[in-house]
Amino acid sequence: MDLTDTQQAILALIAERIDADGVPPSQTEIARAFGFKGIRAAQYHLEALEHAGAIRRVPGQARGIRLAGQGAQTRTAPVSEVARDDVLRLPVLGRVAAGLPIGADIGSDDFVVLDRVFFSPSPDYLLKVQGDSMRDEGIFNGDLIGVHRTRDARSGQIVVARIDEEITVKLLKIGKDRIRLLPRNPDYAPIEVLPDQDFAIEGLYCGLLRPNR
């Protein structure tokens, strides 16, 4: 199926955002970028892209768009049983709060083997989510999120951040004279980082796995 110029441009935008931010654009952002009056037009073009095999969509996720060839695979088998060039063996390093910050619980409890192309950018480890403050981004309690280890992040990216000795996952907003960590659930209040707090970016959110439960 041939793609229209608009659909090719939307596909390019999706790839660009995944490469730059680690997450695809939302339907609202696609509609805004192309001047659509509502998200229905964005949905129409995404349906066409999916039908053409250019993307696949994950039901129930606000940004559940994956480029063709991306897919989740959890394995309990040893790494030697799958092609080493195509997979990552990632440690599950405890918990991260999607709610109020919780005390860090970082330790290698388990490993997950998954397709190398599942996340972007490539993750260094996984954290288990506790809480539902990021539910509108499709991140739910019990999910395993991929984290790309870095100290650098831009405003608008979803980050794993440390405040004193506590770890949380939130949307980073950097203002002229303040830093805030925003939930994606109206039941939670933003967290403002105070000047006397020890604050650091631990990594970028780059996708998730949803264990069977």
Curated annotation (Swiss-Prot):
Represses a number of genes involved in the response to DNA damage (SOS response), including recA and lexA. In the presence of single-stranded DNA, RecA interacts with LexA causing an autocatalytic cleavage which disrupts the DNA-binding part of LexA, leading to derepression of the SOS regulon and eventually DNA repair. Keywords: Autocatalytic cleavage, DNA damage, DNA repair, DNA replication, DNA-binding, Hydrolase, Repressor, SOS response, Transcription, Transcription regulation. InterPro entries: LexA, LexA-like, LexA/Signal_pep-like_sf, LexA_DNA-bd_dom, LexA_repressor, Peptidase_S24_LexA, Peptidase_S24_S26A/B/C, WH-like_DNA-bd_sf. The gene is lexA2. Its EC number is 3.4.21.88. It comes from Xanthomonas axonopodis pv. citri (strain 306). Pfam families: LexA_DNA_bind, Peptidase_S24. Belongs to the peptidase S24 family. It comes from the Bacteria. Residues 27-47 bind DNA. GO terms for cellular component: protein-DNA complex. This is LexA repressor 2. GO terms for biological process: DNA repair; DNA replication; negative regulation of DNA-templated transcription; proteolysis; SOS response. It is an enzyme of class 3 (hydrolase). The record marks A98, G99 as: Cleavage. The active site is at S133 (for autocatalytic cleavage activity), K170 (for autocatalytic cleavage activity). Homodimer. One of its GO terms (molecular function) is DNA-binding transcription repressor activity. SUPFAM superfamilies: LexA/Signal peptidase (SSF51306), Winged helix' DNA-binding domain (SSF46785). Transmembrane segments: none annotated. It catalyses: Hydrolysis of Ala-|-Gly bond in repressor LexA.
